[in-house]
């Protein structure tokens, strides 16, 4: 039979009868031992050769196959006494409740049976909806369970009580119903009555849920391992089966020898415990079976269920070959489409190339190089690791056999060559929460031990460089490589399907640098310009202006060199949002309204609104008008220009950024004192009972709302005072105003005051009895006692302020952790619910049986990445373009 493949037409789930278990079995296991003194499997033991082989050199006694040929075969154990299958306890109770203890019939009258039989016979038990079947059968079972007298034989019935996990008894007695008695009761149920329980008697008789024969899984399901000491260590399942066989033998001997009933019952309970924990070692109500070391055994249910179980861990998702994982590092001079791969990884990862008449000479040259070739300068050169013959045999290439195998290869062979520059690979960072968590990059072989990529690609991956690791997958098929280049390449993912705007763009230093380069259009000498432009292509040169006989270059002209010809765009910069001036193009003293005409920057300041992810107007326009390739080229040039410029110019921030004069500190302290007076007056008014409640609120809520409002006002006002002394010459302010990092609120907390700390939108009120900390009087509801921090980070927080600040900060951490787990679970449920949906050729959304879900994908059939941020058209885009000038 080996080697014969058959197509599976259908799968039917059923219970195994004792006879089927015996027929399926190749050996009756009667001894608990595994190997003899010579290390050879014992006959009729748990490692009997009839159940398969795991040792090289041995052959299976059933099919004659070796280790890699034998699929494994079942054995069986004849149990001394019946035991309840823990997985069917609910069903057993259902049968005991709804059937007569004497005659075994379902406790429905003949009239009810005649009425309900046509209804249940209409149901298709094999292909019907399980929920509909369950609702119908539950109706019959509930009706039958309520009867305390059998309508067929007149026998008085008792209510059945289940003492979990597997003990049954009749109500009012402590005498348990033994598994043997349960089995006898279930055997009396006629086949014709089983339809009312949703059971098919041909595939599932109820007495089969009480075990008399236990199947023993094949050896390759529970292989033993050899430890470093040379001792064998058996699998957890084998340990449990040993316990079951030993207790079953003791129970059989005690029963046959006429031992007292108490001893027999104890051994029977012990056998039930071992069989229960063999199936599920986390059954509530009984202690888990443990290894000698104290570790809980991993039995059948634990191997199947959960994230680490067989289905989710080994079938839905697997570990794969041709992949690599290491720490990531930034490399500002790589293209967004590129990934820097360490030489060590490039030598290990291979791409299969099928030899044909067009590439055979090239492949021979590659093979002749061997495994570790280098050029005359000692740089990496692609080698070959393996060649594969047409019959599937792999030949490892070494420096000794390289020339011989180069001559031997022919058309139809496969050459597994190492990575070379330009190969397309998939790059991924987990958690993979959206499409852009896995994108196609082209390879650049670099020295070092880390993967490197352009910082502009951090946003879609949500990556930073504090120790993050990423995965790289080398594509093995030509069709997949073509797909990756055309669909998955980074430049094709610039626009996010979530909001229809760019998700790849300049971050942090890029934004700061371009802000400094363009704000107020600074002037540079020829030498300075050469330094700034050094990292760009040599043919990109800005337009020079002659002033007093000298060549000068302006920041906007330098930035214009990286813009494509024909680009026309107008927008307000991020600087505008924090400006006190009007941001209109006709009246713009703050230099905040950007205008680009025919690829030349006329006016404005480049900042977050121009080149950053989520808001980059220039990237958005270039992608829509010139395509993905031009957008990627702009981002490459923009990041090189920004890093080159800021490296040359220099940019430093420090604690001195937040120095404000003593007069400003005094003004802030005065503001805080005034606010405290107002809060104290509010509290006095409240205590006198004169505070008027706000509509829909209690007096207490009104007081809290008023105090929070006062605390918010003083923080905002102190922030304004601090900010008025911190202008656009201050590096930290440049970062905040340009959108590179942080906000002016963060800066005001450092230089002004930190302000009111809150938990769940209100002031702090928990802690000790009637006070937040023992440092305050009981009943104190003043500002300081309820989490108002009057210090700034510059001056430093007092111990109580630091404690309150930590409480406020911890809420953010806990909230983040809770939201992460909830959103992760929600996403998993959505994925499972939608996994059978597909978009067909007519853009209709259907499930696997062809049911229509949506007439048009997304109701409108529009790709969000091609929409104008979710709208059909962008009027500004249409109006302000070539026709403008």
UniProtKB/Swiss-Prot annotation:
Zn(2+) 2 binds at residues 100, 103, 150, 153. It is an enzyme of class 2 (transferase). Its cofactor is Mg(2+); Zn(2+). The keyword Transcription applies. It comes from the Archaea. Transmembrane segments: none annotated. One of its GO terms (biological process) is DNA-templated transcription. Binds at least 2 Zn(2+) per subunit. It catalyses: RNA(n) + a ribonucleoside 5'-triphosphate = RNA(n+1) + diphosphate. InterPro entries: DNA-dir_RpoC_beta_prime, RNA_pol_asu, RNA_pol_N, RNA_pol_Rpb1_1, RNA_pol_Rpb1_3, RNA_pol_Rpb1_3_sf, RNA_pol_Rpb1_4, RNA_pol_Rpb1_5. It is found in: Cytoplasm. GO terms for cellular component: cytoplasm; DNA-directed RNA polymerase complex. The keyword Cell wall biogenesis/degradation does not apply. Mg(2+) binds at residues 464, 466, 468. Its EC number is 2.7.7.6. GO terms for molecular function: DNA binding; DNA-directed RNA polymerase activity; magnesium ion binding; zinc ion binding. Zn(2+) 1 binds at residues 60, 63, 70, 73. Keywords: Cytoplasm, DNA-binding, DNA-directed RNA polymerase, Magnesium, Metal-binding, Nucleotidyltransferase, Transcription, Transferase, Zinc. Belongs to the RNA polymerase beta' chain family. DNA-dependent RNA polymerase (RNAP) catalyzes the transcription of DNA into RNA using the four ribonucleoside triphosphates as substrates. Forms the clamp head domain. PANTHER family: DNA-DIRECTED RNA POLYMERASE, DNA-DIRECTED RNA POLYMERASE III SUBUNIT RPC1. Part of the RNA polymerase complex. This is DNA-directed RNA polymerase subunit Rpo1N.
């Amino acid at each position: 039979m080996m080697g014969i493949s058959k197509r599976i037409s259908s799968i039917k789930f059923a219970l195994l009868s004792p006879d089927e278990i015996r027929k399926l079995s190749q050996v009756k296991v009667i001894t608990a031992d595994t190997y003899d003194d010579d290390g050879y499997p014992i006959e009729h033991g748990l490692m009997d050769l009839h159940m398969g082989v795991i040792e090289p050199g041995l052959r299976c006694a059933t099919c004659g196959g070796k280790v890699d040929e034998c699929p494994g075969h079942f054995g069986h154990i004849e149990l001394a006494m019946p035991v309840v299958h823990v997985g069917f306890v609910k069903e057993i109770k259902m049968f005991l409740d709804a059937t007569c203890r004497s005659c075994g019939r379902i406790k429905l009258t003949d009239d009810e049976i005649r009425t309900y039989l046509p209804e249940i016979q209409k149901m298709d038990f094999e292909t019907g909806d399980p929920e509909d079947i369950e609702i119908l059968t539950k109706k019959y079972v509930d009706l039958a369970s309520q009867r305390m007298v059998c309508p067929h034989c007149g026998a008085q019935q008792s209510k059945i009580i289940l003492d979990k996990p597997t003990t049954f008894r009749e109500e009012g007695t402590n005498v348990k119903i033994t598994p043997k008695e349960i089995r006898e009761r279930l055997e009396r149920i006629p086949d014709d009555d089983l339809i009312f329980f949703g059971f098919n008697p041909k595939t599932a008789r109820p007495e089969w849920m009480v075990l008399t024969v236990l199947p023993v899984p094949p050896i390759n399901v529970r292989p033993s391992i050899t430890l470093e000491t040379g001792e064998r260590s058996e699998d957890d399942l084998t340990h449990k089966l040993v316990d079951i066989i030993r207790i079953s033998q003791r129970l059989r001997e005690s029963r046959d020898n006429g031992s007292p009933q108490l001893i027999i019952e104890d051994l029977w309970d012990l056998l039930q415990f071992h069989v229960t924990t063999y199936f599920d070692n986390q059954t509530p109500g009984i202690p888990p079976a443990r290894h000698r070391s104290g570790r809980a055994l991993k039995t059948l249910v634990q191997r199947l269920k959960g994230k680490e179980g067989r289905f989710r861990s080994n079938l839905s998702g697997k570990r794969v070959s041709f992949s690599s994982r290491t720490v990531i590092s930034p490399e500002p001079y790589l293209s967004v489409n590129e990934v820097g791969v360490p030489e060590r990884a490039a030598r290990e990862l291979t791409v299969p190339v099928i030899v044909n008449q067009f590439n055979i000479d090239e492949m021979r040259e590659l093979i002749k190089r061997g495994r570790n070739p280098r050029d005359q300068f000692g740089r990496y050169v692609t080698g070959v690791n393996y060649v594969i013959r047409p019959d599937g045999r792999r030949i490892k290439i070494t420096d000794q056999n390289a020339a011989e195998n180069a001559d031997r290869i022919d058309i139809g062979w496969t050459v597994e060559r190492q990575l070379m520059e330009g190969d397309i690979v998939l790059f991924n960072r987990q958690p993979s929460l959206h499409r852009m968590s896995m994108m196609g990059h082209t390879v650049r072989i670099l020295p070092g031990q880390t993967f490197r990529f352009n910082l502009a690609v951090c946003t879609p991956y949500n990556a930073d460089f504090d120790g993050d690791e990423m995965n790289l997958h080398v594509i093995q098929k030509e069709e997949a490589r073509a797909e990756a280049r055309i669909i998955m390449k980074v430049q094709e993912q610039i626009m996010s399907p979530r909001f229809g705007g760019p998700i790849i763009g300049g971050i942090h230093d890029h934004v700061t640098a371009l802000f400094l380069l363009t704000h107020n259009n600074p002037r540079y000498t020829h030498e300075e310009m050469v330094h700034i432009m050094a990292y760009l292509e040599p043919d990109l040169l800005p337009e020079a202006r002659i002033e007093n006989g000298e060549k000068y270059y302006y920041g906007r002209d330098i930035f214009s060199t990286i813009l494509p010809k024909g680009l026309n765009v107008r927008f307000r910069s991020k600087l505008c949002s924090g400006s006190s001036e009007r941001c209109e193009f006709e009246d713009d003293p703050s230099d905040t309204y950007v205008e680009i005409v025919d690829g030349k920057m006329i006016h404005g300041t480049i900042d977050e609104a121009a080149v950053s992810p989520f808001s980059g107007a220039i990237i958005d326009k270039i992608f829509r008008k010139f395509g993905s390739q031009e957008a990627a080229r702009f981002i490459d040039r923009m990041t090189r220009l920004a890093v080159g410029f800021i490296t040359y110019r220099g940019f430093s921030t420090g604690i001195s950024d937040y120095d404000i004069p003593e007069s400003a500190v005094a003004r802030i302290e005065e503001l805080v004192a005034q606010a405290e007076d107002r809060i104290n007056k509010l509290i006095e008014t409240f205590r006198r009972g004169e505070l008027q409640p706000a509509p829909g609120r209690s007096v207490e809520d009104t007081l809290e709302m008023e105090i929070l409002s006062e605390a918010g006002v003083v923080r905002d006002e102190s922030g304004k005072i601090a900010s008025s002394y911190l202008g656009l010459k201050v590096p930290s302010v440049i970062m905040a105003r340009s959108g590179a990092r942080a906000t002016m609120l963060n800066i005001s907390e450092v230089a002004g005051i930190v302000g009111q700390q809150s938990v769940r939108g209100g002031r702090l009120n928990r802690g000790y009895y009637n006070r937040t900390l023992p440092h305050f009087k009981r009943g104190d509801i003043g500002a300081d006692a309820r989490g108002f921090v009057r210090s700034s980070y510059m001056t430093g927080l007092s111990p109580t302020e630091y404690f309150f600040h930590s409480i406020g900060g911890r809420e953010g951490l806990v909230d983040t952790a809770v939201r992460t787990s909830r959103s992760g679970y929600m996403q998993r449920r959505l994925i499972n619910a939608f996994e059978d949906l597909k978009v067909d050729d007519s853009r209709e959304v259907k499930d696997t049986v062809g049911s229509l879900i949506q007439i048009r994908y997304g109701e409108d059939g529009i790709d969000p990445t091609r929409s104008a941020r979710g709208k059909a058209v962008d009027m500004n885009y249409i109006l302000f373009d070539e026709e403008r000038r």
